[in-house]
């Protein structure tokens, strides 16, 4: 049974004596910039659900005074913590709304929000007001954001970059003990999920379907550099999509020819496109002339996964656990 990270980490008791204290001023390299913290922040605004959930997982919910950019419900176990924190916006907050909370740090998931072309604000704008910013390394390392938008990933995502974010945020807030314990817990959970299905011997393959602009349009499928590719690789599963794009559109005829052992379908709370609805995804797969003949569909090997687990965040581990459990309960690895 999974429990809220903070329940394990924040109550870690005697573990604190083993971790070093942060010495201020602390200077870190973040997304190509030197960022200096004069002291542990007491007021944080997090512009991004992943960043928010990491702060909560480090037991820092009482330091978060505002959040924004939500894709779905908060990580299970943090409902009460999150209910006490002001939500500045479900999507993009304004620069002024962030400043109104008098933050001592602004964290962000994406440079699209806080970066050289940030639509919320540029790091320099905040720093001129004495507010340091910290953007998730997973949006900078092995990724080119110079073209704006979602950017282009240039190297495969690895969980180590999330562990770097956890470790650095723990250092910034002087809670290194919690950071060390959280990273250790996540690594142990990934190892346990791998063990659950043992060796797949390279015999399994998958296609990960995020959504489609129209239900009969080419689907957005996970390429080989994003978080879903890491989930598959962690379990020894081949990704049939070879594109270096993070979410390329690929025709169903092409996917059918690659004959994946399974289809992993994203569950989204948003309803931007009809295919965001997981029920609509299943109806399409079972009714379309091409997809209904795919062995993955006819054999019942279409597995649901929370879309948040497909983001470059600590929820990737939950995605690995979910898929491992689905495979273990099926006849795929027998």
Tell where the protein language model's regions lie, with residue ranges.
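Bacterial N-terminal signal peptides
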Residues: 2-14
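Bacterial Sec-exported substrate-binding components of ABC uptake systems
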Residues: 17-53, 155, 171-209, 327-334
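Short helix-initiation/N-cap motifs at beta->coil->alpha
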Residues: 28-32, 86-96, 139, 244-251
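A short, structured surface patch at a secondary-structure boundary
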Residues: 43-116
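Solvent-exposed loop/turn segments at secondary-structure junctions
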Residues: 50-53, 70-73, 105-106, 111-116, ...
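Alpha-helical, coiled-coil/dimerization segments enriched in small aliphatic residues
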Residues: 72-74, 218-247
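Extracytoplasmic ligand-binding site segments that recognize negatively charged/polar headgroups
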Residues: 73, 113-121, 131-168, 201-227
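Structured C-terminal subdomain patch of bacterial secreted/periplasmic proteins
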Residues: 156-165, 264-334
């Amino acid at each position: 049974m999974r429990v809220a990270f903070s329940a394990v980490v924040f109550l870690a008791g005697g573990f604190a004596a083993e971790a070093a204290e942060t010495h201020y001023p602390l200077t870190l390299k973040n997304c190509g910039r030197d960022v200096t913290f004069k002291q542990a922040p007491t007021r944080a605004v997090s512009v991004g659900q992943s960043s928010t959930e990491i702060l909560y997982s480090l037991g820092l919910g009482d330091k978060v005074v505002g959040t924004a950019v939500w894709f779905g419900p908060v990580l299970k176990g943090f409902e009460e913590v999150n209910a006490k924190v002001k939500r500045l916006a479900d999507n993009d907050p304004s620069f002024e709304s962030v400043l109104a909370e008098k933050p001592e740090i602004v964290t962000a998931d994406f440079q699209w929000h806080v970066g050289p072309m940030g639509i919320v604000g540029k790091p320099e704008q905040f720093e001129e007001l004495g507010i340091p910013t910290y953007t998730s390394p997973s949006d900078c390392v092995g990724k080119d954001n110079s073209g704006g938008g979602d950017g282009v990933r240039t190297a495969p995502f690895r969980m180590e970059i999330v562990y770097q974010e956890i470790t650095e945020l723990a250092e910034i807030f002087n809670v290194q003990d919690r950071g060390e314990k959280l990273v250790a817990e996540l690594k142990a959970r990934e190892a346990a999920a791998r063990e659950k299905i043992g060796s797949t011997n390279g015999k399994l393959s998958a296609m990960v379907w995020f959504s489609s602009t129209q239900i009969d349009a080419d689907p957005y499928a996970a390429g080989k550099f994003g978080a879903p590719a890491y989930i598959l690789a962690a379990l020894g599963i081949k990704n049939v999509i070879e594109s270096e794009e993070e979410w390329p559109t690929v025709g169903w005829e092409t996917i059918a020819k690659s004959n994946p052992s399974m289809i992993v379908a994203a569950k989204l709370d948003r309803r931007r496109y009809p295919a965001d609805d997981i029920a609509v995804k299943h109806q399409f797969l079972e009714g379309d002339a091409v997809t209904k003949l795919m062995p993955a569909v006819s054999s019942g090997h279409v597995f649901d996964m929370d879309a948040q687990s497909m983001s470059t965040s600590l929820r990737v581990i939950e995605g690995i656990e979910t898929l491992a459990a689905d495979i273990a309960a099926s006849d795929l690895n027998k």
